[in-house]
């Protein structure tokens, strides 16, 4: 007699399988849900048009985030101040302490007692993002890295970075070292405004140190037309961060992204929001303040000559090139003030 085996499970087996399947799906759903808030807790982004300060894109721009190695932008800002003041030169040698040499990677693996020039320190911070070099700079400028963190925070306040606190020069993990995407955009704008003579360092694609070549982590310098800065950053608590500056057709944008899941996805998102932002602004749309930052009120006599001499502004005070002749650059509102016979600028 021939025995036929059923290809179907028994009722009990099928019930058990369905129970296991439903349980597995529920577990995966819960796991996925728990991952999303973690990613969202790290993500923030902003794009600003540099000249006008117009915000073209913003997500969580004022939420507190870990800067990671974006911290080194401020370290470089303060180092550039030393160069500007003449207290240091590019050839100044900075000593390496045991504390600096002990910093965890990324690093140049400097040894205690060695020195590094200011110029090489700048390249190492921008390309290799060397943590040992950051501590060397902090100690050279303020004696200890802790004191340097206080100085960094004071400078942040002076630049309008009200939500930023620094505790070290490198961006290595510290629970109280916090910033926002908006504050980092402010720092990038201040860097180019205050130190245009040094800003070109940020477009350096590679740096050689004692026979070794270190490439810049900012891949947009090679992959996104018009990029000329500025810095990447990563620690576990922050995700992959990036501040980028890009200029196309006379329009300069500052982009900041926090919390990327990888360097590649972070860069892709930066390109996406920059592309969208470039489409929203054109060179002719950019407006800038070329005179007073508030209303100007002046009294004039009732009887006026046919023309009033208006001295041109000093070229040194103009943030942008003068417009072509006969270009409408602004307007003046006049109002008659009672019977006194004087004209006053309208408020």
Predicted features, each with a name:
Residues 3-24:
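Bacterial N-terminal signal peptides that target proteins for export
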Residues 15, 30-33, 327:
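Cell-wall glycan-active module
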Residues 161-165, 169, 173-178, 182-347:
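Domain-terminus/edge residues, biased toward the C-terminal soluble/receptor-binding domains
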Residues 31-182, 191-192:
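Active-site-adjacent loops and short helices of periplasmic peptidoglycan-processing enzymes
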Residues 26-27, 50, 208, 224:
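Short, positively charged
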Residues 22-32:
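Bacterial N-terminal signal peptides
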């Amino acid at each position: 007699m021939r025995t036929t085996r059923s290809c179907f499970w028994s009722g009990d087996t099928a019930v058990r399988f369905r129970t296991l399947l439903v349980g597995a799906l529920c577990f995966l759903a819960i796991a996925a849900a728990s991952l999303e808030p973690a990613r969202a807790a790290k993500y923030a982004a902003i794009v600003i048009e540099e000249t006008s300060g117009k915000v073209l894109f913003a997500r969580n721009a004022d939420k507190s985030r870990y800067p990671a190695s974006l911290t080194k932008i401020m370290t470089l800002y303060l180092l550039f101040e030393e160069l500007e003041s003449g207290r240091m030169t590019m050839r100044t040698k900075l000593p390496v302490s045991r504390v600096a040499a002990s910093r965890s990677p990324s690093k140049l693996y400097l040894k205690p007692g060695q020195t590094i020039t200011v110029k090489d320190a700048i390249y190492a911070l921008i390309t290799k993002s060397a943590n040992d070099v950051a501590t060397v700079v902090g100690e050279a400028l303020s004696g200890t890295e802790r004191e340097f963190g206080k100085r960094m925070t004071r400078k942040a306040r002076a630049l309008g970075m009200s939500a930023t606190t620094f505790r070290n020069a490198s961006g290595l993990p510290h629970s109280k070292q916090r910033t926002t995407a908006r504050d980092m955009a402010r720092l990038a704008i201040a860097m180019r405004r205050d130190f245009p003579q040094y800003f070109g360092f940020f477009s350096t694609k590679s740096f050689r140190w004692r026979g070794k070549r270190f490439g810049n982590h900012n891949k947009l310098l090679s992959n996104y037309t018009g990029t000329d800065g500025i810095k990447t950053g990563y620690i576990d608590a922050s995700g992959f961060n990036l501040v980028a500056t890009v200029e196309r057709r006379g329009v300069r944008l500052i982009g900041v992204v926090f919390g990327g899941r990888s360097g590649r996805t972070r860069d892709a998102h930066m390109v996406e929001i920059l592309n969208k932002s470039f489409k929203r602004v054109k060179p002719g749309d950019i407006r800038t303040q070329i005179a007073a930052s508030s209303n100007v009120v002046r009294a004039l006599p009732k009887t006026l000559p046919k023309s009033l001499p208006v001295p041109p502004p000093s070229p040194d005070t103009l943030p942008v090139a003068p417009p072509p002749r006969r270009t409408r650059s602004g307007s003046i509102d006049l109002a008659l003030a009672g019977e006194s016979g004087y004209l006053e600028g309208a408020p």
